[in-house]
Amino acid sequence: MYAMKEKQAQAVSLFQRPLWVAIFALTAAVVWGWAYPLIKLGFKEFAITPDMTGSKMLFAGIRFCLSGLIILMVARAKRISFQVRKRSDSGFLLLYALFNTTFHYAFFYFGLSHSEGARAAILNTLSVFTVVILACLFFKSDRLTTRKVMGCLIGFLGILALNLGGEGVGSGFTWLGDGMIILNALSSAVASLMTRGVSQRVDVFVGTGYSLALGGLLLIVPGWLMGGTLPLITPLGLLYLVLLIGISTTGFTLYNKLLSCNPVGKVAIYNSLIPVIGALSSCLCLGETFYMKYLIAGALATWGIYLVNKGKG
């Protein structure tokens, strides 16, 4: 019993060491950045067109539900307790599943279908700076400092830089594309703030599995009721789906564990690197044009990371 507690303490301390926090947070950012082109490639391989709303929800639901089930099976194999501390906490976990998975990715998949992967990746950083600011209001471990404010402002300038110019995807704001990505970002921000509460109600690993499995199911059911199908199933399409499941499993497991034992803002700010990875991977895999404004926006977001992590608290 003592040895088990000692191992748990060591595991927690590993996720609190600055070097490992950076490594794990960067790993989550890299795998999430690659989700942008893989989703578009998956849609293409499964013959899901932009107007097939039900099919997109079904595709997303299958991805997250399977990811959540994998996490729960691993938790069971490791004999991690599934016990929720209070029955009343079930409502909180359901709400978390809605924001972390259902709302978050319903908006994300819709928006990505009407926006270039590189543009969506950078616009999605709105959630990062929202979390950094709001965390200072909700958690004592996150203090609002001049550096944090400057980091968020500079990062937000990256989003503004994305909308400059009239070339390619810089033609202006659209609700179906940009609007949905922004709503996705806000849902992600709310979920990030709720993660600390999840860790107080159930093991964070189990909570992550619950949120993905349940949230995925809440995407599958309405998607199916809306007539959603997977029109074409190919080996390559299944490979893309498996990769996306792996991305969800890895990204959420690492990110949520880090959020549960570190200042939220210090962890969330690393997601500013997602647009850089998303833009590069979209250009490499989809043949999208890499405009200079992507580079400028990515550089500003990276500068924001430095400022937030340089400060104390």
Q: Where do the PLM segments sit?
A:
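Transmembrane alpha-helices of multi-pass small-molecule transport proteins
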Residues: 2, 49-100, 130-134, 187-191, ...
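Glycine-/small-residue-enriched transmembrane alpha-helix faces in small-molecule transporters
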Residues: 2-58, 98, 170-197, 217, ...
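Hydrophobic/aromatic residues within transmembrane alpha-helices
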Residues: 42, 59, 111, 137-140, ...
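Helix-helix packing/entry segments at the starts of transmembrane helices
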Residues: 62, 101, 105, 119-126, ...
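Juxtamembrane helix-entry segments on the extracytoplasmic side of multipass membrane proteins
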Residues: 17-22, 52-57, 85-90, 164-187, ...
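Specific transmembrane alpha-helical segments of multi-pass solute transporters/efflux pumps
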Residues: 35, 76-120, 124, 161, ...
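Hydrophobic transmembrane alpha-helices of multi-pass small-molecule transport proteins
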Residues: 1-2, 71, 133-134, 146-166, ...
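Small-residue-rich packing faces within the transmembrane alpha-helices of Major Facilitator Superfamily
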Residues: 33, 61, 65-69, 156, ...
